Amino acid sequence: MNSHSPLWSAIAETITAAIDENFGEYSYQPVGGGCINQTYRLQNHSYRFFVKVNGADRVEMLRSEFIALKEMQKTRTIAVPTPLCLGATDQYSFLVLEWLDLRNSHQDQDWALMGKHIAQLHKCTSTKGFGWDRDNTIGSTPQINSWHRDWVSFWIENRLKPQLQLAKQKGYYPKVATKHLWEAVPKLFRDYLPTPSLVHGDLWSGNLSFCEGVPVIYDPALYYGDREVDIAMTELFGRLPKQFYDSYNQHLPLDRGYVQRRSLYNLYHILNHYNLFGGIYAFQADNLMAEVVALC
């Protein structure tokens, strides 16, 4: 793609309309950071932007991200990249965000602040129950967010069953009978009634960082759910620094039964990884299902 291609011309025109001034004489460079979208740094003498590009059929996926970032921004709890605009051509869809110079941190106080801000996000609740006003994606997998008053039914019907159905279509047959899984799930909630909290939905270390010491999260799979889902995922691919968890628990203590539910919540993400990346995750999914059933 060159700067005079229909795609980049459309991006420049959409930015021009969004900032109400001509966005001209620009350049762009590919940047890393994901396997779902093509990503670029786009800049001219006055502005720098982060641009996600995908096929035209993915415009609603990008629209959901645009809306999710706006919703998180409105909470004033944690920083996210400001979404500027989105659009599509015949072949492509695109999302334009502000450019942030993101860095990892080895400072204890930064991770403590991250824990505090995630806790503040989780204090945002919904009176409508568990779900969101639109479906979105987890990675590129469709994620159903129809509203439920009951968290257990939401997690089974909107999270585990769709992923298992897709996994079976791709050749995965769990070693644990799913009927035993469905029987086990409610037992993990006998003494715990979750509150519908605003959750990031895909909170692993690759979707959080720092900009000049300020915690930033991005690439959301947003919905209102049990806040434990976010904390569980921070532990799935290696825990965050201890200061994150200490600070989170100081501001919003976890229920003592969280450790028992962690495998249930991470099962969703492992099934999704199987559906996205293949059979390497089948063994891990079997182990997590066996853990959940054994707990009950």
What are these regions (language model features)?
Residues K70, E235, N266:
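A cross-family signal for key residues in well-ordered alpha-helices
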Residues I144-I156, Q165, T195-L198, S205-S263, ...:
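Active-site Asp-x-Gly
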Residues P6-I19, S126-L198, C296:
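An alpha-helical support segment within catalytic cores of ATP-dependent transferases
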Residues R48, T89-D108, K123, E157-K161, ...:
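A glycine-centered beta->alpha junction motif in the catalytic cores
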Residues N22, H45-F49, V214:
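Short acidic/polar mixed-charge low-complexity motifs
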Residues M1-G24, Y92, I280-C296:
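Regulatory N- and C-terminal appendages and interdomain linkers associated
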Residues N22-V31, L254:
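Short secondary-structure junctions
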Residues Q29-R149, S153:
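ATP-binding pocket architecture of kinase catalytic cores
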